């Protein structure tokens, strides 16, 4: 990968220096390497299942800018992983939940680039939606995903100290 990335762009490379790093390559491919996101799972995974399963079927993979929130999706007695990742923001619909809970977001309060979410995604005015529904609607409208700011999403399994210890031990990350 390092050698191919050093090739000129017109030869299928990224035009990077010969001693490029994985972070250099990720940045050149458009990933936001300055702002990691985190995914919580009980499974050992090699790739993200973006087709989803159960109630999140079709909604994609879920990430947070805080490692604490994904930790709430891990059952403490089953081990689990908090996986740091990078995403490309250029295809995301960005919404501000204004402090709403993940499953009770007022549709009328959401907008993206000055368009109401009800018009943009075909949601009913006066209704409430969830992160799962927003992601599915956005996918159907051609967005690569959604980024939802100011959202409440803490599960019953929340253990802030456990999440911080895990990230420090496994990845050398010390979250705020």
Regions found by a protein language model. Give the residues of each.
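Active-site and NAD+-binding cores of ADP-ribose-processing enzymes
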Residues: 1-176
């Amino acid at each position: 990968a390092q050698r191919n990335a050093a090739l000129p762009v017109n030869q299928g490379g990224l035009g990077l220096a010969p001693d490029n790093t994985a972070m250099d390559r990720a940045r050149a491919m458009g990933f936001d390497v300055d702002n990691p996101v985190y995914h919580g799972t009980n499974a050992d995974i090699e790739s993200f299942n973006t087709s989803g399963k159960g109630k999140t079927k079709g909604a994609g993979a879920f990430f947070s800018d805080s490692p604490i929130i994904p930790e709430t999706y891990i059952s403490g007695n089953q081990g689990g992983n908090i996986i740091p990742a990078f995403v490309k923001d250029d295809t995301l619909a960005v919404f501000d939940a204004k402090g709403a809970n993940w499953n009770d977001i007022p549709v009328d309060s959401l907008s993206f680039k000055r368009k109401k979410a009800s018009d943009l995604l075909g949601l009913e005015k006066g209704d409430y939606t969830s992160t799962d529904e927003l992601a599915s609607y956005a996918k159907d409208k051609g967005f690569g995903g959604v980024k939802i700011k100011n959202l409440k999403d803490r599960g019953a399994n929340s253990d802030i100290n456990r999440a911080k210890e895990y990230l420090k031990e496994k990845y050398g990350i010390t979250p705020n």
